[in-house]
Design a protein with these regions (language model features):
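Hydrophobic faces of well-ordered beta-strands that scaffold small-molecule active sites
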Residues: 52-55, 77-81, 133-137, 160-162, ...
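Short, surface-exposed connector motifs at secondary-structure boundaries
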Residues: 48-51, 127-133, 192-198, 270-275, ...
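Short, charged, surface-exposed secondary-structure boundary motifs
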Residues: 88-92, 234-236, 311-314
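Alpha/beta enzyme core
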Residues: 140-279, 288-292, 296
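Flexible loop residues that form catalytic
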Residues: 57, 84, 165-167, 229, ...
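Conserved strand-to-helix beginnings and helix N-cap segments that scaffold or border functional pockets
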Residues: 65-66, 145-146, 210, 311-315
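Alpha/beta catalytic cores of nucleotide-metabolism and tRNA/nucleoside-modifying enzymes
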Residues: 2-4, 10, 17-36, 251-276, ...
């Protein structure tokens, strides 16, 4: 059933059916599919059949949602695997997840089987013909980041995302990503051990995300993911205790979308001149949301929390983006990236006209 609410301006669905043909479940993935649709793009040299990226922690290691009828990994341009550390981790004590108004708090604690198991057991089970798979690297020390990155570099994974929001145990537990110097050190160290596309996931929990982006670019990142979750908490007033076992958790979902959108715009001001692509993420649930992020400067858009209540949301977002492109006479989605018109842009147009 076509959801016209997801199509900006009530666009006629029939206008985009040819454009969506290659996104059907049985269509070929990879470069062939990418060449056939206006949703296709190139991201760090990789062919994406869609601008949608499924975010780390929301689809396990890329196979969980394939058990749902109607779901297909082909609806996403790429899938980011669950955060992986050097050794296996059990994660945080319960409760780990809590629903909030227009969002969700989570504090999973990087539960994962460790990089050796992921590389030897999980990666061989993935169908790399369906979509691109991106590893998510986490660590408590720079040395751990480097070792996990090195292991993924020798694997069939398509790209590597660095989660720099992890606490640095050598510096009292402060998050690497909250400080430009620490962020740059992690990126530079990982850059030295891989030739695969390197994506740095920026934290919003910092003073100046633009400076952090600039330092990560100088350190060698190929792309930026903006933003990670925003730290928050919830309290059980009867027990007078935190609801989340870890006290605090990461807030995601529609509640953070305006913040994420601003951060993407700010990072694009730094990354755009260097042609560093951005994965914009934070509260995307509809095609209109995705379009806002693309206009703000994102080349690709991340979908995460929305998958928990609508596993088929990616297909609907793809349909809505394609409809918008058709209605506005745009040949492909890349023509829309960074086309935000600010008051300054309008003033410049008036002066030059």
């Amino acid at each position: 059933m076509w959801n016209m609410a997801l199509l900006p301006g009530g666009i006629d669905a029939c206008a985009i059916m040819p454009a969506m043909a290659s996104l059907e479940k049985d269509a070929p993935a990879g470069a062939a599919a990418a060449a056939a649709t206006p949703l296709a793009l190139e991201f760090c040299g990789l062919k994406f059949a869609s601008p949608i990226v499924l975010l780390s922690g929301c689809v396990g290691f890329g196979e969980e949602y394939t058990r749902i009828e109607g779901f297909s990994n082909r609806d996403a341009g790429a899938i980011v695997l669950k955060g992986t550390t050097g050794a296996a981790r059990l994660g945080n004590p319960p409760h780990r997840v809590y629903e909030t108004p227009a969002g969700m708090l989570n504090a999973i604690g990087l539960q994962n089987p460790g990089v050796d198991h992921v590389v030897r057991v999980i990666l061989p089970q993935l169908d790399f013909s369906e979509t691109r798979f991106i590893a998510n690297v986490s660590g408590s020390t720079i040395e751990e980041y480097v070792e996990v990155t090195r292991r993924f570099d020798a694997s069939p994974i398509d790209a590597i995302e660095i989660n720099i929001s992890c606490p640095n145990v050598k510096e009292g537990g402060v998050a690497f990503g909250n400080y430009p110097d620490m962020s740059a050190q992690v990126v530079a160290a990982c850059r030295r051990v891989t030739n695969k596309p390197l994506i740095t996931k920026l934290s919003p929990n910092q003073t100046d995300i633009r400076e952090n982006a600039r330092r990560c670019i100088e350190a060698g990142t190929d792309a930026l993911a903006v933003i990670n979750t925003i730290m928050g908490m919830a309290i059980d007033v009867e027990e007078r205790r935190p609801v989340i076992g870890n006290v605090q958790g990461g807030l995601s979902g529609p509640a953070i979308k305006p913040i994420a959108l601003l951060k993407v715009h700010q990072v694009y001001e730094v990354a755009g001149p260097h042609r560093i692509p951005i994965i914009g993420q934070g509260g995307i649930t509809t095609a209109r949301d995705a379009l806002e992020f693309i206009i703000a400067g994102a080349t690709a858009v991340g979908v995460g929390t929305a998958l928990f209540y609508d596993p088929l949301v990616c297909r609907r977002i793809n349909e809505g983006i394609a409809a918008y492109l058709a209605a506005h006479g745009l040949a492909d989605v890349t023509e829309l990236v960074g086309t935000l018109r600010t008051a300054k842009d309008l003033a410049d147009c008036a002066l030059s006209g």
